[in-house]
Amino acid sequence: MNRITNNKTIWIKPKYVEKKWYVIDASDKVLGRIATEAVKILRGKHKPYYTPHQDLGDNVIIVNASKIRLTGKKYSQKIYYRHSRYPGGLYSDTFRTLSERKPTAPLEIAIKGMLPKGPLGRELFRNLKVFADSNHTLKAQNLYKLEAN
C-alpha cells in the first residue's frame, strides 16, 4: 500500500496568476543560452507553483535578435530546413542567409523547438515577442530587465 496519499496535482486558476513582462537583450549573447533562459520564463519554471500542464509562465520580449552570436562555424554551417508541402519542395537555408532575410527567425525557431509540442506549446509561444533591434512597441507594459549569460 502506498504510504504517501497526499500527492495531488496542483491546479491554479488563471485569475490568480500574475503575468509579468521580462525583457532580454540578446546582443552578443549565444543563441542557445538566450533561448533556454526565455523558455524557463515562458513555461513558468522560475515560479514555486510551476506545473507542466498549465500556462503559468510570464511574457518575454527579446530585443537585438539580429546581433545574436553562435559558437564555432555554425554561422555558415548550421542549416535550417523547411518544406512547401509540394513534391520536391524541400528548401534549406544557412544561418547566415536566414538571419539576413528574417533576423528574428533563428531565435524563434530555437525557442519553439524547446517548447512542448501541442496546444500548450502554441499558447506559450504566443507569449514571446522577438524584435530585431532595440525598438519595440511594448513600452507601456511594466517591464523587468532580465540579465542572461
Curated annotation (Swiss-Prot):
GO terms for cellular component: cytosolic large ribosomal subunit. Keywords: Ribonucleoprotein, Ribosomal protein. It holds the Pfam family Ribosomal_L13. One of its GO terms (biological process) is negative regulation of translation. One of its GO terms (molecular function) is mRNA binding. It comes from the Bacteria. PROSITE patterns: RIBOSOMAL_L13. Coiled coil: none annotated. Signal peptide: none annotated. HAMAP family: Ribosomal_uL13. Belongs to the universal ribosomal protein uL13 family. This protein is one of the early assembly proteins of the 50S ribosomal subunit, although it is not seen to bind rRNA by itself. It is important during the early stages of 50S assembly. Part of the 50S ribosomal subunit. PANTHER family: LARGE RIBOSOMAL SUBUNIT PROTEIN UL13M, RIBOSOMAL PROTEIN L13. This is Large ribosomal subunit protein uL13. It comes from Borrelia hermsii (strain HS1 / DAH).
